[in-house]
Amino acid sequence: MSVVGLDVGSQSCYIAVARAGGIETIANEFSDRCTPSVISFGSKNRTIGVAAKSQQITHANNTVSNFKRFHGRAFNDPFIQKEKENLSYDLVPMKNGGVGIKVMYMDEEHLFSVEQITAMLLTKLKETAENNLKKPVTDCVISVPSFFTDAERRSVLDAAQIVGLNCLRLMNDMTAVALNYGIYKQDLPSLDEKPRIVVFVDMGHSAFQVSACAFNKGKLKVLGTAFDPFLGGKNFDAKLVEYFCAEFKTKYKLDAKSKIRALLRLYQECEKLKKLMSSNSTDLPLNIECFMNDKDVSGKMNRAQFEELCADLLQKIEVPLYLLMEQTQLKVEDVSAVEIVGGTTRIPAVKEKIAKFFGKDVSTTLNADEAVARGCALQCAILSPAFKVREFSVTDAVPFPISLVWSHDSEDAEGVHEVFSRNHAAPFSKVLTFLRSGPFELEAFYSDPQGVPYPEAKIGRFIVQNVSAQKDGEKSRVKVKVRVNTHGIFTISTASMVEKIPAEENEVSSLEADMDCQNQRPPENPDAEKNIQQDNNEAGTQPQVQTDGHQTSQSPPSPELTSEENKIPDADKANEKKVDQPPEAKKPKIKVVNVELPIEANLVWQLGKDLLNMYIETEGKMIMQDKLEKERNDAKNAVEEYVYEFRDKLCGPYEKFICEQDHQKFLRLLTETENWLYEEGEDQAKQAYVDKLEELMKIGTPIKVRFQEAEERPKIFEELGQRLQHYAKIAADFRNNDEKYNHIDESEMKKVEKSVNEMMEWMNNVMSAQAKKSLDQDPVVCAQEIRAKIKELNNNCEPVVTQPKPKIESPKLERTPNGPSTDKKEEDLDGKNNFSAEPPHQNGECYPNEKSSINMDLD
C-alpha cells in the first residue's frame, strides 16, 4: 500500500513518500525533486513538468501554467478576469460557467476545464511516484492553501478523482508544515503542561499564509490562520518586469509587453535575478540576447534598489501577522519560535520584516521547499494501516465562519445561526434539532463575505426531504448533523426524524422490560448520559435562542430549534413521577423510531457524475495516446541509434567481420535509412520503425555475433584446455599409483581417460577447422557449444576424481571402571547429594538451596 504526499503548487510540485526508513522526497526522470506545474500540448501528445517548461516560450499559446487558483471559480469572477490579462494561453467560459482553457492538441482545438488540467499534472506526479516505489499509487494526501473555500476544495477533489487517486485528506499547507515540524520534536511539553506556541510563515509563488499552532507531546492544534492570497513571489517578479520594461522602452525603444515570448523571457530572467539578489548585495547584470527585433538588451539591479522598488509589497507582510495575533489573542512574548518556509521567504527583506514583527530571529530548520510535501506524506502514513507511526493527533481550524439560514413553518421570518465560528476546531460535527411538519430547506453560507477571497458567500442549499407531522398532528423532531470534514468541506451529512408509533401487543412486554431496566440503572448512567448530551451541546446541538430570526444568548430558547440537553431534566422528573405515583390505568404504549431522511444537496460548485465520468474517459484516452507516442518515439530512436552505432563500428572493430562487398552495401543501407528518418520517415507509425530496425538487424546481427564469438572463443577454448590438462594429470597420477587416487576403481578412471581423449580430439578438430575460416565467415563452433562441452566433461570426470577415500575405523578403547575422571564425577555427584541432604554446620548458616531449607524445616 502506497503512502504519498503531494504538494501541488502554483509554480512547482513536490512528492514525498513514506518508506521503512522514514519520509523521503523523490526525484523525477530528470533527477530533480521539483516538478514544474506546467503542461504543454502538441500535435501528437502532451508534455508535463520539466519538458513542458522548456517549451513555455516556444509554444507559449499551448503551454498552461499558474492555473491552481482557477479552481472552483466562474469565468466572470473578477480574479479570473484580472489574471487573464497576464496569461499566454486563452481562457474561455465553459457551459457550466466555469473557466475553460483553450489549446491546440492533436492538431485540433480543445477546451479543457481546470479540473482536467490539474488531473493531467496529478497524472505526472502519480507516474513519478509509481516509478520510484515500483508499485501502484492510489492513496495520497494533497495540499491546498488554508484559504481555499468549499468550492475550490471540491474542485481539487474532483481533479484527483479524474486521475484515479483516492485523496485521504486535503491538508492545509500550514497544517502540513506544522505536522512535519512537531512529529519529530522530542522536547514538547506534556499534555498537562502549557503548550508551546509556534508561528509558521509561508510565502510561496502566489500567496502568503501564516498560522499559530499549539504543541504538546503527541498533539498539534491549529489556533488560527491568516493570509494574503494575492501576495507572493510572482508579485516581486512583476515589479522587476515592470521596471525593466520601462527601462528597455526608454533605452532601446522596445515594448516588451507587445510580444508574449519576449515578456515570458523577461519574466524568467527577472526570477533568476531575484534569486541572485538574495545572496548578493552588489549590482547584478541582466542580459538577454536577441530579445526583440534581433536586439540584445541589458540592465542591472542591486538589492537596495529591489527593496525600494518592492516597498509596498513588504508593507503588506505585516497585515496577516497582525490579524493572526488578534484572532488568537496571543502576545509576541507567547510565541516560542517562528518557522519560515516557501521560496520567497529567502528574500532578505521578507525575513527581516517577519523577524522585526516578532522581535526574534526567524528559524529555518525546515526545508523551505519540501516541508509541505513531507507533512502530507506523514499525514498519509498516519491514516494508512500499512505504516505504524508515532501517535500524533492533528486538530485543524476552520478558516472562515459558517452559518445556516432556514425559514419557519408558519412565519415569513428566517432563522440564522453560526454553526462554526472562525478558527473553530476541525474536523468537527454538530447536531441541530428542528421541529417541522414538512420538508424544509437549509442554506449554508460564509458569515463574513468580506474576509473570504471568493466572490460567492453561499456554500450550498440542502433540502431535508420526507418530513411529515406526527399522527397526532404535532411537529416532528428532525435531527440534522452538520460537519466540517477532514478535507475542510462543509456538509450536512445525515438527517433523521423522530417518529412516534403505537407499539404492537407482542412488543409491549419488551418495552415494559426495557423501562424496568432503565429505572433500575445504577446512578452512574444518568451522569454518563448527561456527559454525552454536554458533548453534543459543545458540538453545537442547537442555537440557544431566536429573536426575530436572529440568535442571541439572552433570549428564551427557540420554540423551533430545541436542545435535547434541555429536555433531559424534564424527562427525569417524569420518570420520577411515574415511580412515585400509584399505578394508573394503562395507556397505549408508544414506540420511538428514528427514520433516516434523504438530503438533496445543491452545491455552488460540484461536477456532475456524467461530466466527471466523461473527464475520466478523456484522461484515459490522453494517457493512452501519450503511451503510444512514447513507444513510437522509442522505436524511432532505436532505429537512429542502430544506424549511428553500426556506422561507427563498421569502420572500427566490425570492419574485419564483413566482406568488402557486404561492407559497402551495408554502409549504403545505413545512409539511406538515416536520410529516410529525416525525410519520409520523420512521422511514421511505430510499426514502420520496427520493420526498418528488423531490416537492419538481418545484416547487422550476424556481424555483431561474429565479432562477439571471436572475442569469447579463445578464452573459452583456453578454459577447456585447462580442464583437459587437469583431468589428464589426475589420470597419469593414478597410473603412477599416487596415494591420492589409489582408492578409485580402474574401470572408472578409464572412463575419465576416454572422456579426456575424445574431448581433446574434438577440440583439436574444431580449432583446426576454425583456423581455416576467415573472420568474415560464420564460425565453425560458437561459444555456447564450447561451454556445453566443458559442462559435459565436468559431469563425466568430476564425480570420479573427487571420490573421497573410505574411512578406516580405529579400534574402540575399553572404558576402565576406575578412571580418574569417573571418580571425580562421582565425588562431585556425591558432594552435591551430601550438600542437599545434610543440614548446615556453621553458626546455623543456610545455603540458598531449596532442598536444604526443606530438610531444616523438617528437623
Swiss-Prot record:
Give the sites modified to Phosphothreonine.
T562, T816
* GO-annotated molecular function: adenyl-nucleotide exchange factor activity; ATP binding; ATP-dependent protein folding chaperone
For bias type Basic and acidic residues, the affected ranges are: 564-585, 806-815, 822-831
N-acetylserine sites (modified residues):
S2
Region annotation (Disordered) maps to: 515-585, 797-859
Q: Which UniProt keywords apply?
A: Acetylation, ATP-binding, Cytoplasm, Nucleotide-binding, Phosphoprotein, Stress response
Where does the record place Polar residues bias?
Answer: 533-555, 850-859
Modification N6-acetyllysine, positions: K471
Residue positions, PTM Phosphoserine:
S509, S510, S558, S810
PTM: Phosphorylation on Ser-509 may be important for regulation of the HSPA8/HSC70 chaperone activity.
GO CC annotations? cytosol; nucleus
Q: Which PROSITE patterns match?
A: HSP70_3
Principal cellular location given in the protein's record: cytoplasm
Q: Where in the cell is it found?
A: Cytoplasm
In terms of SUPFAM superfamilies, this protein maps to:
Actin-like ATPase domain (SSF53067), Heat shock protein 70kD (HSP70), C-terminal subdomain (SSF100934), Heat shock protein 70kD (HSP70), peptide-binding domain (SSF100920)
Query: How is the quaternary structure described?
Result: Interacts with HSPA8/HSC70. Interacts with HSPA1A (via NBD) and HSPA1B (via NBD).
Q: What does this protein do?
A: Acts as a nucleotide-exchange factor (NEF) for chaperone proteins HSPA1A and HSPA1B, promoting the release of ADP from HSPA1A/B thereby triggering substrate release. Prevents the aggregation of denatured proteins in cells under severe stress, on which the ATP levels decrease markedly. Inhibits HSPA8/HSC70 ATPase and chaperone activities.
Return the protein name.
Answer: Heat shock protein 105 kDa
**To which species is this protein native?**
Bos taurus
Its gene is HSPH1
